[in-house]
């Protein structure tokens, strides 16, 4: 009997539909983030598989797999897991995030909401033939994508389809003749050449504050920085300094402060990004679609089935110690 525990509210989102995709006898338990309900600590301790997005080092004892139903793993203390426990993540969010990015980019060029609001009061500001509403086209713009993983590749393909000039900065070489490729050591140079800079990188020891004052300072006046990776990849203080006077714009979906049990609805930063008209802010929603949930649930099922059959797991972040 495979004992599977969904640890916390976020993880529980991926439980419906899992059972039908599993090939072995199993028992599924959903527990709270606080692990304070009746029998929850015992369930966590005895689980063969834990599905969760965070782990502080307490409670997991027998697990052979800690499966993240998400890409980011910066909230998981992997060293505190049992030696025989593998850690794997899941993707499947790249289509959703790419749609978010393109929607955000298009919204800066095609002001549908403002045009609708104005015309409802008889204001023809954007009418064809009028000089005030003349706008640029997305295909006249350039974008620099930081990271060439699942998200970066999905955005790249869509940006190219719109006719944008695409640059990519990545740790390893980018073999795509359609784009201008840069190493991460050339990040500052790339950021000075484009109209939009998009971060897609996860948060690791090497990516924290990768984009700081020097990199932001190299950007053109009026350029826009976007973040759908992890918030702290872009230095919080440097970013606010770069946008508060209006020189740069920003579209921010990932943050520095998140809801907690103690503060369920915090502002997303110590700085007042929310007061700036040149900054668009959203609550880490870019990848949250029914398609993402379905694809990630399928990944969880695939790894549980592989574990039961003794096969190699997919998306391994940390292999079990022998």
Task: Say what each PLM segment does.
Residues 1-49:
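N-terminal glycine-/charge-rich "phosphate-binding" loop or analogous flexible N-terminal tail
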Residues 33-45, 54-59, 177-194:
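Short acidic low-complexity segments
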Residues 43-44, 60, 138, 188-192, ...:
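A short, aliphatic-rich alpha-helical micro-motif
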Residues 45-121, 135:
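Phosphate/diphosphate ligand-binding glycine-rich loop within oxidoreductases
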Residues 116-154:
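Glycine-rich NAD(P)-binding loop of Rossmann-like domains
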Residues 167:
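Conserved beta-strand positions in the Rossmann-like core of class I SAM-dependent methyltransferases
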Residues 172-270:
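Rossmann-like adenosine-cofactor binding region
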Residues 222, 230-322:
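Rossmann-like dinucleotide-binding domain for NAD(H)/NADP(H)
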């Amino acid at each position: 009997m495979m004992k599977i525990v969904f640890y916390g509210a976020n993880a529980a989102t991926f439980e419906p539909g899992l059972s039908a995709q599993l090939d072995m006898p199993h028992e599924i338990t959903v527990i709270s983030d606080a692990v304070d309900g009746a029998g929850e600590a015992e369930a966590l301790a005895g689980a063969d598989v834990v599905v969760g997005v965070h782990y502080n080092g307490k409670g997991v004892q027998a697990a052979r797999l800690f499966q993240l139903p998400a890409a980011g793993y910066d909230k998981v203390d992997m060293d505190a897991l049992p030696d025989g426990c593998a850690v794997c993540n899941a993707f499947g969010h790249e289509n959703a995030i790419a749609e978010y990015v393109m929607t955000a980019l298009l919204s800066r060029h095609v002001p549908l909401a403002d045009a609708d609001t104005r015309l409802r009061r008889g204001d023809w500001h954007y009418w064809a033939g009028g000089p005030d509403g003349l706008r640029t086209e997305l295909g006249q713009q350039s974008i620099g994508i930081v990271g060439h993983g699942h998200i970066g590749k999905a955005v790249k393909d869509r940006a190219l389809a719109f006719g944008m000039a695409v640059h990519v900065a990545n740790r390893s070489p980018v073999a795509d003749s359609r784009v201008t490729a840069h190493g991460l050591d050339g990040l500052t140079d790339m950021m000075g050449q484009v109209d939009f800079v998009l971060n897609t990188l996860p948060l690791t020891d090497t990516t924290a504050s990768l984009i700081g004052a020097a990199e932001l300072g190299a950007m053109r006046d009026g350029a826009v920085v976007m973040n759908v990776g992890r918030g702290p990849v872009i230095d919080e203080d440097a970013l606010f300094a770069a946008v508060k006077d209006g020189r740069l714009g920003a579209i921010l979906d990932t943050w520095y402060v998140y809801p907690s049990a103690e503060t369920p609805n915090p502002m997303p930063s110590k700085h007042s990004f929310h007061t700036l008209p040149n900054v668009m802010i959203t609550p880490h929603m870019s990848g949250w679609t029914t398609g993402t949930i379905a694809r990630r649930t399928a990944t969880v099922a695939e790894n549980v089935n592989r574990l039961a059959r003794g096969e190699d797991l997919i998306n391994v972040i940390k292999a079990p110690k022998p």
